Every structure is written in structure tokens, then in C-alpha cells.
Amino acid sequence: MTGRRVGAGLLGLALLGLAGCSTTDDGPDPEESGTPSSAAPGRTGTPDPDEDADEDGEGRTDPSGTADPSESADSHGPGTNRPASRRWRPRPGTRWQWQLDGRVDMSVDVPVYDIDGFENSAKTVAGLHARGRKVICYINAGAWEKFRPDQADFPKELLGENNGWAGERWLDIRRLDVLEPLMAARIEMCRKKGFDAVEPDLTEGYRNTTGFPLTAAHQLDFNRMLAKLAHDRGLAVGLKNDLDQIPELVGDFDFAVNEECAQFGECDRLAPFVRRDKAVFHVEYALAPDAFCRDAKRLGLSSMRKRLDLDSWRKPC
């Protein structure tokens, strides 16, 4: 399993959820197929016909808000900086797939894929582009992972408490002088592989027990640094969770990625992104399908049910 995160309260569910999960995309609902609901509940539903306009997944470029119809998903080619005026920006309601575990299933008919940046090659990204998909590069920004190839580049004094996942420790995000070149290298990797955007994970460390006296101000500085590093390379960037800081950060990020806002009654807090015509890519794990799809559509979220291990299985609204 790759190093993706859920809330600390779901760690027990995460461990249980790795058992008994098939990798069949859009397959049977785990509750219907005998998988315990605590393993990885999510949601069912059928695609919204109103979302067909986003089938091709172009979204909008920034800042003009008008997509260039002549630009294919991979027209810039791997390793090429896109001008800021042509940076991809997905629109609300754009359908997506989020797969961080296992070989990427390219058959899912959605315009946006979010996949692990380290574990997937430029060839995989190009293959998705050839199918007309935009591709988001998942990286861990807020924690050190001992299984990544650059793990030795992180000074020991920057490593804090374990974040609840084996082999991972919170980073001291106050040290922008050290972390900026390390994060720049990761985002540059995404650019060279041809990704269209970046999803930096663990961008709300200040609300956790990290081993460092992190504040909201430290988090804002770190998150804005990440956004600038992506934008400087022509990549879009998504804000992961961090609901409390959306009012301050919505202008710095091109879309949002959220886990379980419906579970905790917080989806309305993502409205600033939708109001700015920016997509909110949203998943639920522990709710029944009919518990959040109606509200998700009302709010303009791009919502689906996923298992906690984030294999290819999905149930979109």
C-alpha cells in the first residue's frame, strides 16, 4: 500500500480495510458483496448525466477560464513547463479516479486520474494522456517516508513523531529553507514525468501531534510554498483537506482534494472552491452511498466512494 493518509481516527478502519477488497473498478458494493461495512464503506450511485460536459476532462485554464480546444491532454509533452496562462484548472463536477495502490487501471472512463508520483512512470502518464485524461501527481509533503528513494535527503532533525503509518514521521514544516529544495525536487519529478497537477498530502500538520510547535501561520507559509513550486513549473496544485485554512488558501490553489467531509458534516466548508469555479475532488469511506451523494451534487463536488487502500475500485455519485 502506498503512503496515503486518512484521519487518525480511521487508522483502525484502514488496517481492517486492507482485507477482503477486490480491485475491480466500479464493482459490487462491499456491503452488497459480503465485505464488512467497516472494511471500507464508501458510496454507490450512477454518474450524473449533467456531468457529461466534463467527460473530456479539459477543465479550464487559468487565469482566463477558457480551455484551449486545440490543446490535447499531453500536447506539451513530458518535462515541458506550461505557461501560467495555460495551466490546467479542473471545474466543479469533473469526474475523477484516485488510485494509489496497485498497477493503474487505465480503463476507468473519467477525465481525471490522481496517481502516485513516485510509483508511476512517464510512460504511464503518457498512456493516460493518450486516452484524453489529465493526470494528478500524488506526493507526500508533510511527512517523511522511509520507503521513498529520496528518504536519505531529509535531515534527521526535521523528522518528528510517527504520523500513524508505518515508516512515516511528521516533518518540521517551519524549516522552509531545508524543505523547499526537497519539495521542489519532488514536484520537478512530477513535471518531468508529464503530470498536469500535483496533490501534496498532509498539509494540515499543525493540527496534529507532530513533535514540533507548529502554528497555523507555519502551515500557511508551507502550503503557499508548495503552491508556488507547482505553479512555477506550470502545474496545477490541489489543497488536501485543511478545511480551516480554505478562506486563506483558496486563491493559491487550483482545486481541492477532500476525504470524508460528509462523514464529519463539513462539506459546506469547501464552497469557496466551487464559487471560484474550481473542482473539489471528494471521497468517502465509511458512509452508505445514499448518505452523501445528494448533498455532494448540490454542492458541486466531484464525489465517489473508495476503499481505504485506494485501489482501482470506485463508486461514483
Task: Please annotate each region the language model reported.
Residues 12-16:
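Intrinsically disordered, low-complexity regulatory segments
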Residues 2-11, 22-34, 76-317:
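Glycan-processing catalytic domains of CAZymes
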Residues 18-89:
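N-terminal low-complexity, Pro/Thr-rich disordered segments
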